[in-house]
A protein has these predicted regions:
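Extracytosolic helix-loop segments that constitute the early lumenal/periplasmic catalytic or substrate-binding loops
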Residues: 2-28, 32, 40-50
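Transmembrane-helix motifs of polytopic, lipid-linked glycan transferases
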Residues: 58-84
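Membrane-embedded alpha-helical segments of multi-pass membrane proteins
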Residues: 62-70, 115-123, 143-150
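Specific aromatic-rich, kink-prone transmembrane helix
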Residues: 74-77, 116-133
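Short hydrophobic alpha-helices at membrane interfaces in multi-pass membrane enzymes
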Residues: 87-91, 127-141, 170-177
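Short helix- or helix-capping micro-motifs
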Residues: 93-99, 140, 144
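Short acidic/glycine- and proline-prone juxtamembrane loop motifs at membrane-interface regions
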Residues: 108-116
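Perimembrane helix-loop-helix junctions
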Residues: 153-178
Length: 178
């Protein structure tokens, strides 16, 4: 995928988002992630980074690595807040995620962007647990635009709506507001 990401980043920066999708070019990602690649293409062009150099590849992997780190931070925060873990226990939870070989290999080595999707799903779940419906809907929509695999979590969103809106003193207003 990293070779596709490199080509797509250059293409979307060169031709623009409006002309990016065409019959001549293989693109199997939705437009959300293409805007991330647009920024990478712009940075590469602005800084004169050689195509497919080590720095270019690092730039392409950076969104996934940053999302891995954000997931680790969220796990730390939630372990402390919701589970009432001690600071050291929360650090262990975050490290258990951040240093598992699958996470490191997937993002840092292979260059896959599954952690972008993972971060979106975690955020959606946290917003649903807090009864923050509009942010949950927005994050879900962004997730679908980033990776269509987010659709797999539609039942989670629907159960959150059912729980918050219909099972707790029904009100249509709660469909949109806390």
């Amino acid at each position: 995928d990293i070779a596709c990401f490199a080509a797509w980043a250059d293409r979307i920066f060169t031709v623009g988002p409006g002309a990016f999708y065409s019959a001549e070019t293989f693109t199997d990602y939705p437009p959300g992630f293409m805007y991330v690649l647009y920024l990478i293409g712009a940075l590469r062009s602005l800084l004169g980074i050689p195509y497919y150099s080590s720095l270019h590849i690092m730039l392409l992997k950076l969104p996934a690595i940053l999302c891995d780190m954000a997931c680790g931070c969220l796990l730390y925060k939630e372990a402390t807040k919701r589970l009432h873990f001690s600071e050291i226990q929360s650090v262990c939870v975050a490290c258990a995620y951040l240093f598992q070989p699958a996470i490191i290999l997937n993002s840092s080595c292979w260059g896959q962007v599954d952690s972008v999707h993972t971060l979106v799903v975690i955020l959606m779940g946290l917003f649903l647990m807090d009864g923050k419906m509009l942010p949950a809907y927005a994050i879900y929509g962004i997730g679908v635009l980033l990776k269509p695999q987010t659709l797999i979590f539609t039942p989670v969103l629907l159960v959150g709506i059912l729980d918050h809106v219909f099972l707790q003193d029904f009100s249509w207003r709660k469909f949109f507001y806390n």
